[in-house]
From Swiss-Prot:
Keywords: Cytoplasm, Glycosyltransferase, Purine salvage, Transferase. GO terms for molecular function: adenine phosphoribosyltransferase activity. The keyword Ribosomal protein does not apply. This is Adenine phosphoribosyltransferase. InterPro entries: Ade_phspho_trans (IPR005764), Adenine_PRTase (IPR050120), PRibTrfase_dom (IPR000836), PRTase-like (IPR029057). Belongs to the purine/pyrimidine phosphoribosyltransferase family. Catalyzes a salvage reaction resulting in the formation of AMP, that is energically less costly than de novo synthesis. GO terms for cellular component: cytoplasm. It comes from Phocaeicola vulgatus (strain ATCC 8482 / DSM 1447 / JCM 5826 / CCUG 4940 / NBRC 14291 / NCTC 11154). Its EC number is 2.4.2.7. The keyword ATP-binding does not apply. Homodimer. Pfam families: Pribosyltran (PF00156). One of its GO terms (biological process) is adenine salvage.
Length: 174
């Protein structure tokens, strides 16, 4: 999928969720069947030969392509969620945000030392949530970890949140 096609199908909403913020709404990419298929096909081609055994999707828009990609890759799908959303025993990572802290959790038995894991979310801004998820999956003993986003907000330097030896892929940088 061309970057121009992605950008043309991405909705921009000014002053959301607060004044002064330009929100990039990826739901317009998901409601367009051609875009949805192209994104899935592109992600599949990027990771089909990496030996991925688990895809971790970050709540909540990371669930959409993460689940579809896991099925296409023949991998398991793991949900990374905010506290109180997962029913079994969890492991968690707390991380700093601009105003306070937040926590991300996965089931304790979701990842093990034999897993090659792809972490997926829709958009890379500051990288805080994904960096916490990366640390969490590392603690679970994953053999190898890849990170992917559909969109990257380049001006926010979110890649700095990750160790230099981690591959971070995006389909479109704005």
């Amino acid at each position: 999928m061309s970057k121009e096609t992605l950008k043309a199908n991405l909705r921009e909403i000014p002053d959301f969720p607060i004044p002064g913020i330009l929100f990039y709404d990826v739901t317009t990419l998901f409601k367009n069947p051609e875009c949805l298929q192209e994104i899935l096909d592109t992600l599949y081609e990027m990771y089909k030969d990496k030996g991925i055994t688990k895809v971790v999707g970050i709540e909540s828009r990371g669930f959409i392509m993460g689940g579809a990609l896991a099925a296409r890759l023949g991998a398991g799908f793991v949900m990374a969620r905010k506290p109180g959303k997962l029913p079994a025993e969890v492991v968690e990572e707390t991380y700093a945000k601009e105003y306070g802290t937040d926590t991300i959790q996965i089931h304790k038995d979701a990842i093990d030392e034999n897993d090659v894991v792809l972490l997926h979310d829709d958009l890379l801004a500051t990288g805080g949530t994904m960096a916490a998820t990366h640390r969490l999956v590392q603690r679970c003993g994953a053999k190898k970890i890849f990170i992917n986003f559909i969109i990257e907000l380049g001006g926010l330097n979110g890649r700095k949140a990750f160790p230099e030896d981690i591959t971070v892929d995006t389909l479109l940088t704005l």
